[in-house]
Amino acid sequence: MFNCDEDLKAYEDELYHEETSSDESIDSELEFHLYSQVHYSQNLSESKPEEDTGGDSVTYVPGAKQQNNACTEKDDKLVDIIILSDSDAKVSDTCPVIILSDTTEEDSVYSSKIKKKYSSTYVQGESLCGPCSHSTPKVSAPQSNNFKSQKSCQNSSSKNYSGGYVQEVLVIRGSSEDEEANKSENDIIISESDMSDVENWMLLGRAKEDGDASIQLNLEGYKILSDDEGERGAAWSISEKDVEAQIGNYTPLRRSNRYYTDKNVVCRNCDKRGHLSKNCPVPKKLPACCLCGERGHYQNSCPSRYCLNCFLPGHFFKECIERAYWRKTCHRCSMPGHYADACPEIWRQYHLTIKAGPIKKPKSHSGQKDIVYCCNCAKKGHCIYECKERRMNSDKLPTCQLVFSYDHEYDIRKRNERTKSKIKDFQKAGLLTCEMREFSESKVDAKPPAKKRKKKHPSKKERKGTIRDYECAETKQKKKHKKRKSGLQEIEGDFPRGIPNSYVELKKPSKKYDGSFLHLDKTKDMFKNRQKKTRRGKRCSSAVDQDLLIIKQKKKKSKRKVA
């Protein structure tokens, strides 16, 4: 194309609009376009230092001798000049693209390092320019061996006649890059995008898409990747977990398990291993009730549901016989909302009882604490049952947290009897469907009935301290006191002091025996009364003078036999 060096220099002067090569000033237009190429070059900030091999670099070296004197400063570097094919075309007014590559990065300010790939075929003697010149058309030409042998740095110009425009490209390389380029020619990769009509410079993010060509699916063996495709280059294959995981238990629309999860799962429906309940072939279980725990019904239709008014099972609040809970008053704690049989004090009295048996009572009376806060108004000095302000929840009535009385065995037995009678009333009304089941021992634990033994009455020592002993003693003393008074009055009537006025009166004549049995009954009563009087007289003889005692002796009458 250019036979002489003079023609080459003349063309170079026309290209750069320079009169002499000794001019050290930098053209402002060239500097502007150079900065624009650096700024708009793709993946400038995303380039990594790991991708150093096989890539072109765009650098801006500060100094006045950037264009013409850049190669003279480094004479030991080998220069590669890309020559484009000749054809008739017009020279474009656009600024040429200058690509500078330098192995040493000490003086560089802007650098872009991207992997370089060469096409496997040379169509009409064209080669790839490099990923840095995305804003320029694809221009390439076979490199001549004459220019490779030259070691002196020379500026070369080229023309591209595709589309009727010329685009000048200046490529400066070092000797180390030529060796890497020769190695990379041996490893040639053909991509689908190169075979299509769309060229590489028309695609955005081409550098990222190049790596996607190495993705392979459903691998069964292993493959060693080349160094150009990745730095690892290690042998890899499908993980053993992927092979061992037998993921066949899933619906066609959604996978039920991941490959790393354990397949030894237990089904909640059939209690077998290997599948989940949603994939179980056995029909699903019926729902369980939260009240009775049986399957086949829900809480609303449970036969053992309980009432919120009387707290008994079998019916709801609307069907309850008793009055509403807000109209009830407890005679045990004097609180509204319940009766004595459902008083919370019943279970609250077992706060000291640990073992089965009688309820333990505290030795000292535990009163209310000095520092008390109300949970309704959050004020100090009173509890919720003493609060006079409006309730936060009007449906629930307050109760006292203190224990006023402790139950005895008699009270517990009576309360159980009352609950049984209440259950019978509900059964008659048809509100309680479940039957009462008493505790029955199993046949294994059942024992033959023991012989009945005589009940031994407790001795006097054992009786001491009971309430009945005190009551019996009081009644005995009262009876003795009454007997003493009655005995003294009878003695004075039988044994008067002095001669009373009634003694002068004549005695009435006795009646004769009529032959009836009524007389015998009267005589028996009279005899018993006389015996009682004599006993009382002996006891009270010390209180009466012996001289004044007149003992009346009567003759015993012989009983007549009735013929």
From Swiss-Prot:
Single Gene Ontology BP annotation: nuclear mRNA surveillance of mRNA 3'-end processing
An example Gene Ontology CC term for this record: TRAMP complex
Transmembrane segments: none
An example Gene Ontology molecular-function term: RNA binding
InterPro entries: TRAMP_AT-DNA-binding, Znf_CCHC, Znf_CCHC_sf
Region (Disordered), start-end ranges: 41-64, 133-157, 443-494
PROSITE patterns in the record: ZF_CCHC (PS50158)
ZnF endpoints (CCHC-type): 265-282, 287-304, 305-322, 328-345, 372-389
PANTHER family found in the cross-reference section: ZINC FINGER CCHC DOMAIN-CONTAINING PROTEIN 7
Protein name as annotated: Zinc finger CCHC domain-containing protein 7
Organism of this sequence: Xenopus laevis
UniProt lineage: Eukaryota, Metazoa, Chordata, Craniata, Vertebrata
Chain's gene name: zcchc7
